[in-house]
Design a protein with these regions (language model features):
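Conserved short alpha-helical segments that host acidic/polar catalytic motifs at enzyme active sites
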Residues: 1-172
């Protein structure tokens, strides 16, 4: 999970391994760290540690992805050939979320960066970016991993599974 506190202009992040455990039991002890956050993103991933928090010329942002990138190794090598580096490895392999972030940051805007991602990857990727200005949701261009936007009086929510929206009084 990652949250942004506008008053403190600070990102908070917490990553937990959810194997053999429920989400709530892992995150409940750390929820107090998110006090004052007015927006947040999160994902449950079997492969990549996320969210990542990035500082770039676009500004600071947190990113989560749901992705299956078929040309991951090829793209990683291209980035290494451009003198880029990878700090996050997942089981000794390139973290897909970090690779996506490295494809975003050459853009002049977040939207241009996301378009760059979709031009380069083979496969699918949906993502949420938490910026200092809000959340950007980008669905994979093939629709394999959907993003549904819910709305209620005091805010919005984005998810890949809309079943919780009814319980939380969000309208699709």
């Amino acid at each position: 999970m990652a949250g942004y506190n506008k008053e403190e202009k600070a990102f908070t992040r917490s990553i937990h391994n959810l194997e053999n455990s429920y989400f709530r039991t892992k995150f409940e002890p750390t929820l107090s760290r998110f006090q004052g956050c007015t927006s947040g993103i999160g994902v449950i991933s079997d492969t990549d540690a996320q969210p990542l928090v990035i500082n770039s010329h676009l500004g600071r942002f947190a990113i989560v992805t749901v992705a299956k990138i078929q040309n991951l190794d090829e793209l990683a090598q291209q980035l290494l050939d451009q003198n880029m580096h990878f700090a996050e490895l997942s089981s000794g392999k390139t973290n897909q979320t970090e690779l996506i972030s490295l494809l975003i940051i050459p853009g002049r805007t977040f939207v241009e960066g996301i378009e760059n991602v979709f031009r380069h990857i083979k496969g699918s990727c949906s993502m949420l970016l938490l910026t200092e200005d809000g959340i950007i949701a980008a669905r994979d261009k093939w629709g394999r991993t959907p993003i549904v936007i819910g709305r209620k009086e005091d805010g919005f929510a984005a998810t890949s599974e809309s079943t919780a929206f009814d319980n939380l009084d969000y309208q699709i």
